[in-house]
C-alpha cells in the first residue's frame, strides 16, 4: 500500500487507479480499523493553532483529501475545519469491501472544491490559499492565488510558487 501511495504522489500512477489498488488491499478488514488508524494519527505541531488563528482573522479553512472520510471527518472536526471533501470506503455488515463509493477525490475534484468553496464565500480564486504535498494537488495549488508545496514530493516542489519544508507550523 505504501509503495502504491508513494508512486501516485510522485505522479507515476493515475490517482484513481492507485486508490482502487490500495483500497482493494483493505477488503475484509473490520470497520473497527478506523478507530485504530485514528489513534495513530497526530496533528503536526501548530496545525490546530494555525486553524484557530485563521478563524480569528475571519478566514474559512477547507480540507480536500484523497484520504477517507472515515478518518478525515473526525480529524477535521477536532481541528475545526469548515469544509471537508474526501473519499468514502464501502462497508457492508461491519467489514470493508475493498471498494470506494461516490465521487473519487481526483485532482479535478480538488480544483472544483476550491472553486466551489471560494464562490460560496464570495471570493475570487486569487483570494484563496491552497497547500498540498502530492502530484494530485498541483492543479489546485496552481489555481489558488497563493499555492504552497507543504513537505511535498519533488514534482510539487518544482512547480509550486511557495514552499514549506518543515512539518511544524
Range-by-range predicted roles:
Residues 28-29, 35-169:
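C-terminal cap/substrate-recognition subdomain and adjoining C-terminal extension
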Residues 13-24:
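Long, charged amphipathic helices and adjacent flexible linkers at domain junctions
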Amino acid at each position: 500500500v505504501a509503495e502504491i501511495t508513494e508512486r501516485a504522489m510522485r505522479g507515476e500512477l493515475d490517482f484513481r487507479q492507485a486508490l482502487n489498488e490500495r483500497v482493494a488491499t483493505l477488503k475484509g478488514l473490520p470497520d473497527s480499523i478506523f478507530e485504530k488508524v485514528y489513534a495513530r494519527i497526530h496533528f503536526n505541531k501548530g496545525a490546530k493553532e494555525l486553524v484557530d488563528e485563521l478563524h480569528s482573522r475571519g478566514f474559512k479553512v477547507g480540507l480536500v483529501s484523497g484520504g477517507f472520510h472515515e478518518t478525515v471527518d473526525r480529524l477535521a472536526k477536532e481541528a475545526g475545519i469548515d469544509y471537508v471533501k474526501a473519499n468514502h470506503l464501502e462497508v457492508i455488515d461491519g467489514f470493508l469491501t475493498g471498494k470506494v463509493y461516490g465521487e473519487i477525490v481526483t485532482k479535478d475534484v480538488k480544483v472544483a472544491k476550491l472553486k466551489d468553496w471560494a464562490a460560496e464565500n464570495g471570493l475570487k480564486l486569487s483570494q484563496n490559499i491552497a497547500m498540498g504535498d502530492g502530484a494530485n494537488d498541483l492543479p489546485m495549488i496552481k489555481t489558488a492565488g497563493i499555492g504552497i508545496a507543504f513537505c511535498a514530493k519533488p514534482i510539487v516542489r518544482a512547480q509550486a510558487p511557495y514552499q514549506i519544508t518543515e512539518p511544524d507550523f
